[in-house]
Each structure stands twice: as structure tokens, then as C-alpha cells.
Amino acid sequence: MQLFSWPRSHLLEIGDQTWCPAWLHQHEQLVLTQLWNLRTPGWSHGSLAKQACAVFKVHLKDLSSYTVLDICAGAGGPTPVLESELNKGLESEGKGPVQFVLSDLYPHVEEWERISKKQQNVTYIESPVDARAVPRFAASSKKECRIFNICFHHFGDEDAAGILKSAVETADSFM
């Protein structure tokens, strides 16, 4: 059964182009991060990032046992909000925090450093991480959940299939 009657779109961002200057790519990432935190009164039930927290709570029953690896994290996306909101809830329940790790093929280290200084449960991988071949990063005592926040438009069908295959083979869950 096909749910959609149109073909999958492979969209590009200006920042993805080889001719795009790094400063513009970083600015583009910052704007996209702000969109995750945008709340439209009367139209939405909180920001998209806060709404995503509900998905975590429903599908990952023991959040404290996870390390969440944000693939294609850009300038941080929803991860700072996810960390803050989810860990407030865990703390109120007397549970330990869930850890978050930012990664990207083009790491935005300056922004990630700023985030991790404010939020002790957010760390980052300074070297490039190719979403098509991600090794396991979680400690052996932790489960690993990979999150893919509006990033699949960067990939063709073959790469997208490889990314999901990698997540199935080397992580415990993905969203």
C-alpha cells in the first residue's frame, strides 16, 4: 500500500553546496535551530522540540539508560531543548539523566561548545561523523538511540537506506 502519490524529494540547502562559504553554512544551521524552538501561540502546543519530548517519553521507557546520538546535528537543532525538558522530568522522578551527543559531517564545534558549557548532559564529537557509516558511540553500559532531525532530505535513496541499516545494526533504537 502506497501512502503518498508523489515521489520522494531530494532537496538541497545552500549550505550543502561546495561553493557556499562556511560562515553562511553556519548561519543557516543557526536559523534552522531557532525554528525548532519557535512557538506560534494559538496554533501550536509548544515548540517542535518540546513536542518531540513526548515521543521520547512514549517510546523509550527507561530514558536514563540511553545515550542519544544526534546525527546531522547542525548547530544543535532540538537537542538542547530535548536535554533540558527530558532531564527535568527524569530528575523530578528521581532518575538519572539521559545523555546527548552532537555529531555532524561538518561539526559546528563553536556552537556545540557553547551548548555543552551550559548543559552538562550534552557533549559533542569534534571530528566529522558521516551519517552513512556511524560507529557505536554509547558506553557499553548504555543503550544508544540515534536521532535524525529533518536530515534525510540531504541524502539520496541509497544513502538513506544505508543510514537506517547502520542504525539498525549498531544502535539500540532510532527516531
Report the location of each language-model feature.
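Glycine-rich phosphate-binding loop signature in dinucleotide/nucleotide-binding domains
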Residues: 62-63, 138-142
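Class I SAM-dependent methyltransferase SAM/SAH-binding core
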Residues: 66-137
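Hydrophobic adenine-recognition pocket in adenosine-nucleotide-binding enzymes
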Residues: 151
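A short, conserved alpha-helix within the catalytic core of class I
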Residues: 155-170
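Conserved class I S-adenosyl-L-methionine
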Residues: 173-175
